A protein has these predicted regions:
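Structured, hydrophobic secondary-structure cores that serve as assembly/anchoring elements
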Residues: 1-118, 139-423
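A short, well-structured beta->alpha microelement
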Residues: 118-136
Length: 423
């Protein structure tokens, strides 16, 4: 028998959280088909089917903190519910299991300082599926991002070095369903589904699961990055840049305005990228952009950026640009809210004037913040004749000249003789 002794064990279940941006209010929705909420949610979140994550610290904390099981209160971080692997189970080496790719999708968005809203699909005590939960406009959303739910090994030079995550048809179709049910947020998609999506540029067409309209952004690009800092393998991860582009929207909302373009070197910088899986050539970028697909591009010495701001709307419309589309989404939310206050009021000149007086200052502020070139509000007897009033209707017409983003720059250098007067 061994002599009496004391054994001291140090069990490291901490995480070194990567550097992130912070302070944003942009709310991005994510649809989980692989039990993210049953594994990482509080009891209250499992009951509601909605999990809200406000920071990267919260997201990592859900991997390492004990599950309160039945309290569902402030201590409600990670750990499996008892039916999913035992009370207080943890994942000190990083996410594992069927929900691994979904965890990394949300992770890559949270780096940009936004708020993630995850909806489950009929898991645990929740009786409401994610599609219904996130389609409900009472859950405020600014964007919805396609999950990368599928996983395969990442092999470089014949050696297994990590994991590759990618979207399948269902991931894209889920986002399309929610976005087109709401019509008040932007859907951010990898341009197609599949494991070899971004290995090389072979097909410019967007997924047939995406409805082509001003509420959809298709993104070409996948990045490689390192796993969690205390993962013994610290292996390489590969995931498409759709969550990063949603992060660029969050950055734009925080640092500029809703109606600014999220692309380019000021607001479109892609974080935590070791390298892109494939960096498209100039000719390939031209082909993508002609088909309304926004490439993520690495410029040597300058960084990796979102290098396009098109939606999938018809090219003949100014709504084919992200900033214009988001301007009208913003107006729809704000003006729609103001208009609801008029319901059941008296349908007369005083009410019409009150509406105009409430809307014009808002539009003037947007104009001062570079969102519109000009505007006009018409709400009088010209569009509210007796025939409209008699059927209890109220009509307002708001004409907007939205500010456009710069997509093409032309600079001409002219060589002139010394004798030419340049004054």
């Amino acid at each position: 028998m061994a002599r009496p002794n004391v054994t001291v064990i140090i069990d490291d279940q901490s995480f070194v959280i990567p550097g992130t941006e912070s302070g944003g209010l942009h709310r991005a929705g994510f649809i989980s088909d692989n039990a993210l909420i049953p594994n990482l949610g509080t009891t209250a979140e499992r009951n509601s089917g909605i999990m809200t994550i406000g920071s990267m610290g919260d997201w990592y904390g859900r991997l390492s903190s004990l599950d309160p099981i039945q309290s569902g209160l402030s201590a409600g971080y990670g750990g499996n519910h008892s039916s999913y692997g035992g009370t207080g189970a943890r994942w000190p080496g990083g996410p594992t299991g069927a929900w691994e790719g979904e965890w990394w999708t949300v992770h890559n968005y949270l780096q940009y300082g936004g708020v993630a809203v995850v909806g489950s699909t009929g898991e645990e005590e929740s009786t409401v599926g994610a599609l219904d939960a996130l389609s409900n406009k009472q859950v405020a959303l600014d964007s919805v991002v396609a999950m990368s739910s599928a996983r395969t090994g990442l092999t470089l030079g014949g050696v297994l070095v990590g994991a590759k995550y990618y979207s399948v048809v269902g991931d894209i179709a889920n986002v399309n369903t929610v976005v087109n049910a709401r019509l008040d947020c932007i859907g951010v998609y990898p341009h197609k589904e599949g494991e070899t999506l971004n290995d090389s540029w072979t097909d410019a067409a967007a997924s047939t699961s995406i409805t082509p309209n001003e509420y959809a952004i298709a993104v070409y690009g996948a990045k490689r990055f390192l796993g969690t800092s205390n993962d013994a393998d610290n292996d390489v991860k590969e995931l498409n840049c759709a969550p990063d582009v949603a992060g660029c929207l969050a950055r734009t909302d925080r640092e500029s305005e809703y109606w600014f373009s999220p692309a380019g070197f000021k607001r479109g910088d892609i974080l935590d990228s070791m390298r892109l899986v494939y960096n498209p050539t100039d000719a390939e970028q031209d082909e993508m952009y002609a088909q309304k697909i926004n490439p993520v591009v690495t410029f040597p010495g300058e960084g990796t950026v979102l290098f396009g701001d098109k939606t999938l709307a018809a090219a003949t419309s100014t709504l084919s640009r992200i900033n214009v589309s988001r301007l009208f989404i913003y107006l729809k939310k704000i003006v729609g809210s103001a208009a609801r206050s008029l319901l059941f009021e008296m349908n007369d000149e005083d009410t019409r004037n009150a509406f105009v007086n409430s809307i014009e200052p808002l539009l003037e502020r947007i104009k001062g913040r570079r969102g519109v070139y000009d505007y006009k509000v018409v709400c009088d007897e010209s569009n509210n004749p007796g025939s409209i009033v008699d059927v209890n209707q109220f009509v307002a017409d708001v004409f907007i000249k939205p500010t456009k983003s710069i997509n093409f720059i032309r600079i001409t250098f002219t060589n002139v003789n010394t004798s030419v007067d340049l004054g």
